[in-house]
Amino acid sequence: MASKCLKASFSSGSLKSPGKAGGGSTRVSNMYSSSSCKLPSPSRGARSFSVCSAGLGRGNYRVSSCLPALCLPTGGFATSYGTGGGWFGEGILTGNEKETMQSLNDRLASYLEKVRQLEQENASLESRIREWCEQQVPYMCPDYQSYFRTMEELQKKTLCSKAENARLVVQIDNAKLAADDFRTKYETEVSLRQLVEADINGLRRILDDLTLCKADLEAQVESLKEELLCLKKNHEEEVNSLRCQLGDRLNVEVDAAPPVDLNRVLDEMRCQYETLVENNRRDAEDWYDTQTEELNQQVVSSSEQLQSCQSDIIELRRTVNSLEIELQAQQSMRDALDSTLAETEGRYSSQLAQMQCMIGNVESQLGEIRADLERQNQEYQVLLDVRARLECEINTYRGLLESEDSKLPCNPCAPDYSSSKSCLPCLPAVSCSTGAARTTCSPRPVCVPCPGGRF
């Protein structure tokens, strides 16, 4: 922050004196330009003090100072003494003071050069840091939007493929269920056919048994008929033989029981046997009918039980198939979720690794920046020490200048010159603060050396 101070510029055009080289008229002009006086901040500010001397020959002797520590008109003070013919006699300052001022000026120039060099290095470091940050920005913040869009499209395609696969799996499972239903129906029909065939075979065996019984009964009837015929034949033979025997005898009528009618007896026996056969046949038919009814009832009950069991089995199979389908769907969903979880973990692990790398890079950069800040703080402390020393030297300079100004005569060329008179000093200087009033130096004559070398 540049400080604005009162400036007093004393420019000397030419001093004319007879008999001297480059003689001419002597002209002194004073110019005062005032502005506000502002104290700079402790951290920065323009502080310069330089002495340039061209020796005793032709040239200029200029003393410039900028002392923002005090609210003096010499905050930007420039005084020049110029003569067309050069200086006559000795200079204002002695040899030791000139050497001291020259050494101070050299040290100040070296300090300023060092400060300028440090500022240039700081600017170069800032530019390098800025360039490095600009170069590192693409690596620190890469653009993954295209990859994310591609991943989203692939995920959508994968989800569509998974949905299509699940639909096909459901269709296949439905076809398997239909095939299982048809298989169970076929097996049921086959079992019913086998049961009917077994019943038919059983009834055939019963029919064969009944046929055998009928054949036995018919054989018994035939044997009984043959026996009856034999008995009839024997009876006729006996009757004939008896008649033949009775024909030769007398006819003796004997009051006896009436003779037995064999035909009637045979008819009665025949009727008895026929009734017995009919009863046996009826009993066999009744037994067969009862057995058949019982078997039919058992078959019906067993078929009903079988149908109920088969329906229960079909329902259980459907339930099992639906549970298997649901289990497969849950397993496929679990596999999809596991794959999605693995992909998400891999993606986030890669992003975490990238973030950790970025954090490591940023931490390393932060460490470098902190090291640079520490170094700059150290340099700043060194510069503060240098500034303090420069302020001390500037105060020393100011004391020397004030002592020299007090030694200079007000008008050495005047006839009523008195060595006791001196230049009027400036008003008391007060430090520039917020509450203090600012004061300016009153105009005073410029002290220049006389042409005759009186001073």
Swiss-Prot record:
Transmembrane segments: none annotated. Gene3D superfamilies: 1.20.5.170, Single helix bin, Vasodilator-stimulated phosphoprotein. Residues 97-408 form the IF rod domain. The record marks L316 as: Stutter. The keyword Coiled coil applies. One of its GO terms (cellular component) is intermediate filament. Residues 405-455 are annotated as: Tail. Residues 1-97 are annotated as: Head. Residues 144-244 are annotated as: Coil 1B. GO terms for molecular function: structural molecule activity. Residues 98-132 are annotated as: Coil 1A. PANTHER family: INTERMEDIATE FILAMENT, KERATIN, TYPE I CUTICULAR HA5. This is Keratin, type I cuticular Ha5.
